Amino acid sequence: TSSNNVNESYSEKDPYIKNPINSNSQYYEFQGYLVYQLKDAITSVTDLDDPDKARLVFRCDIKDDVSGIVNQYLDPILGVYTPVEEVSSVISSGMKGSVDNGVEYSFNITEDKFALGATRLVNHKTYYFMALAYGYNKTEENPFPYFTDDPNYDGRNQPFIAGRRNIQVYSAIPHFIEQEYGGT
């Protein structure tokens, strides 16, 4: 198979965890899905943070009291950690899905997030989407990222990890279905 998340069983050892608190804490585990509407078919996973090219339309995650995930990235020039909210703890207005309610496998998209004016989907127009699985490792959460000499410090301050395999652009074309399934 081309996925490392078969049956949502993704687990990857975090090479940066040296002193795990327990035997499971050195692993990233599957946490949820993020689904983006893309501007066009050539938008790639590297463009997901660019609102001119990708917009988050759906999010769900496992039920486990993890609602939002923030990674800390070290700025090599300034020498400071910058927090980046990778997964929001709330559902934004107009977005579908849930926070910490369990994984959902079916949802409706009714709005074009790139539309200027009326946002309702247009029949027979092609829309593009990308689904991204992501993982989480609680041990990567260090409340004091600068105290690297602390014996409890471990990891890189990056509890969020994005899926890297089997990422594809999917197209969808809305249309009336009355004529299908024996309709008249």
What label would you give each PLM region?
Residues 1-184:
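Extracellular/surface-associated beta-sandwich interaction domains
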